[in-house]
Amino acid sequence: MSIEKQVAEQLLEIKAVFLKPNEPFTWASGIKSPIYCDNRLTLGFPKVRQFIAKSLAEKIKQTFGEIDVVAGTATAGIPHAAWVSDLLDLPMVYVRSKAKEHGKGNQIEGPISKGQKVVVIEDLISTGGSSLKAVEALEEAGAEVVGIAAIFTYGLAKGKQLLEESGTKLVTLTNYDELIEVALNENYVTGEDMETLKEWKKNPEKWGK
């Protein structure tokens, strides 16, 4: 079984992903969605989080080669970045969404030097906006961000466009299309639900309105 399918299966099993085609969730952005993904739940399942960390570490080595620093996005990316940096035996930093308003006023916590090659670790990619803020902060600090590694992506057109425009490479362990296929095969959803789930992906902003 592929990594994509294994991770999708695990996320469904521990209920980190909820699929409710008939009772949609409302995201903070206002988008109505038949799916809600909360990868923070992986923290409570040692075997799942270990598999995720190992898979991210392998994917980073295969895709980006030698890097100098692993950066986690605050807050959900931090634990995964810590485990991955341990496996790769590399320094780690984390990046806030904005600079602190007290103390040193840091946006990046941990040492970063000019020219260091960095991979940003994120738990989830929707539009990619928060990840790109982290990339921007690291580049302003002089780092060379070689890409983003995430557990899951919705694969939304808006997110793909933003990442392409910024020239940032994204690798993920699994994605929306793989996940809904696994959900159908494992009887989490019906064939009718699948049609709804596919429709949402085509136009999330207008779906359910």
From Swiss-Prot:
Q: Supply the EC number(s).
A: 2.4.2.10
Metabolic or biological pathway: Pyrimidine metabolism; UMP biosynthesis via de novo pathway; UMP from orotate: step 1/2
Residues that hold orotate according to the record = 126
Q: What biological-process terms (Gene Ontology) are attached?
A: 'de novo' UMP biosynthetic process; pyrimidine nucleobase biosynthetic process; UMP biosynthetic process
Keywords of the record: Glycosyltransferase, Magnesium, Pyrimidine biosynthesis, Transferase
Alphabetical list of InterPro entries matching this protein: OPRT, Or_phspho_trans_dom, PRibTrfase_dom, PRTase-like
Residue positions annotated to bind 5-phospho-alpha-D-ribose 1-diphosphate are 96, 100, 102, 122-130
Listed cofactors: Mg(2+)
GO molecular function terms noted in the UniProt entry: magnesium ion binding; orotate phosphoribosyltransferase activity
Q: Give the reaction(s) catalysed.
A: orotidine 5'-phosphate + diphosphate = orotate + 5-phospho-alpha-D-ribose 1-diphosphate
Which EC class is the enzyme in? transferase
Complex and partners? Homodimer.
Instruction: Briefly state the protein's biological role.
Output: Catalyzes the transfer of a ribosyl phosphate group from 5-phosphoribose 1-diphosphate to orotate, leading to the formation of orotidine monophosphate (OMP).
Supply the HAMAP family for this chain.
PyrE
The record's annotation in NCBIfam families points to: pyrE
Family membership: Belongs to the purine/pyrimidine phosphoribosyltransferase family. PyrE subfamily.
Q: What is this protein called?
A: Orotate phosphoribosyltransferase
| Primary gene name | pyrE
